Amino acid sequence: MASDLEGKAVLITGASTGIGAAAARAFARLGSRVAVHYNTSRDAAEKVAADVRALGGEASLVGGDVTDGSVIKRIVAETLNAFGRIDVLINNAGGLVARTRIEDYSEAFLQKVLALNVIHVALFMREVIPVMRRQKKGNVINVSSIAARHGGGAGAIIYAGAKGFISTATHGWAKEVVGDGIRVNAVSPGVITTPFHERYSTPEQLKGMQATIPMNRLGTADECAGTFVYLASDDLSGYVTGQVIEVNGGQYMP
């Protein structure tokens, strides 16, 4: 199953912790070559890279702030230098920045949320799609959020809107590049136990979220990882493009 991913070059942004790290390990088990991106958490990224190698994959570290377009160019160049190609791009980096009420919005805050969750994804597309076009094949997997479905809680509305953009743009990008042998999909995680919620959600908030989930528990990063493998594998999902796959324990159903 997913044996076609052996040797494939996979660039994962935000791969030092959480869902990105779990995805890196999942691809490693299949023999993929993984570019593990980090911003400030180099030690954590080095641990993930060591895990990738121990699990049977190859690993390369790529670091930098994805809100800087010149850094994105360098990350892509370093990945190509390490692996010679990019078969799978996973746009996982992102963040809430801060829970901010409407009356406290500043231009700097709004720009930071959009840079971290929208603009850098478009810039990675700009840099990687030409590479995949030359290869005549490739897979892009964006990361949306359940917040795109319900608009986010208090203080998280701009983040939710940014993730709504990712879901919508995934449909459009998929149509634009389908003729080039490139598939574009998205994974939309629900409430997952990662550093994201450790930072931005209180235990009381998480308890309230859990009460709305039919499975009556929060998800794990490892439970998201299989969806990335599925979407990256042409053997498993070769006829799937332009889709947003929900991984949320049944909290929201189409």
Predicted regions located by residue number:
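Catalytic Tyr-X3-Lys loop
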Residues: 103-123, 137, 141, 166, ...
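Active-site helix of classical SDR
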Residues: 125, 162, 170
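Conserved glycine-rich cofactor-binding loop
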Residues: 9, 16-17
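Alpha-helical segment proximal to the catalytic Tyr-Lys
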Residues: 130, 171-176, 238
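The beta1-alpha1 cofactor-binding region of Rossmann-like NAD(H)/NADP(H)-dependent oxidoreductases
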Residues: 42, 63-75, 107, 222-223
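Conserved mid-core segment of classical short-chain dehydrogenase/reductases
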Residues: 73, 96-111, 134, 154-158, ...
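Residue(s) in the substrate-gating loop at a strand-loop-helix junction
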Residues: 145
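C-terminal substrate-recognition "lid" of short-chain dehydrogenase/reductases
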Residues: 4, 218-247, 252
